[in-house]
Amino acid sequence: ITEFPLKAQVLPEGAIWEFDSYEDLCSFDADFFLNVDSRIVDNICRVVGCERSAITGVSPIKEGISNLSFLFTVDGEGFVYRHPGSGTNEVVNREAESYSLGVAKELGLDHTFLYEDTVEGWKISRYIPGCRSFDYGDGEQVRVALGLARSLHQSGKTSPWSYEPFEESEGLVALLKEAGYPLPENFSTLSADIRKLSYLSSLEDGKKVLCHNDFYGPNLLVHDGGMELIDWEYSAMSDYACDIGNFVAQGSGYSVDEAINILPL
């Protein structure tokens, strides 16, 4: 193609309206939220127990990696609605997640959970204002975080589902190949090394316990009232070392000695 002609249709001022936020749209059409056909709005009303008119302050949350989430307010109380990202239901067992969320709430590890639809994968949680990013360099925060993990591992709670990190990773690779995604250079060599390490670690496997399996900084909400362990999408029975390994490997920046020093905590 050497040419790509474009034609423009010039419209008069005021013919097209641009809205930067939900509030802008509602200012233009006060009845929009009351009349819009949205299962998401219906889900909120059913779980929270409110009328559509009570839902205000809708704003997107940009921190999510794989899901689409937004914040909203009902009668002055904040909530978060999570809509599962495209393809996430292929890699996340929503029944296992919902089960573990119930356990986490019972154990006092996550006070935010309200409801999850195990078929569609959407979830509603309470919003905790004033949360701070977890600091791997703060000894007290590290102590509290590892205490949450220990409480889970030693709770005696079990799950009908299990999670094997290497097997799960192989499943993800298969999905990527099926979708035609290019794998990194020398991936086969790295995969072989990981397979060998997985085998060696399996020789020392102890009793499986209920684990979070995504235990690292972004999933630890630090606030004035304590700390919450959120995002239980991969939680199931596993080797407790999986949680410790995640905590160290995903962004801690620890040296080998620093990683060893946190183990007694």
What are these regions (language model features)?
Residues 1-17, 23-32, 92-93:
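Catalytic-core segments of class I nucleotidyltransferases/pyrophosphorylases
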Residues 21, 143, 264-265:
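Helix-rich C-terminal or lid/interface subdomains of diverse kinases
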Residues 37-57, 154-213, 223:
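An alpha-helical support segment within catalytic cores of ATP-dependent transferases
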Residues 59-166, 181-189:
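ATP-binding pocket architecture of kinase catalytic cores
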Residues 59-81, 198-242:
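Active-site acidic catalytic loop and adjacent metal/ATP-binding pocket
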Residues 86, 130, 227, 235-237, ...:
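Activation segment
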Residues 241-265:
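Active-site activation/catalytic loop segments of kinase-like enzymes and analogous catalytic loops
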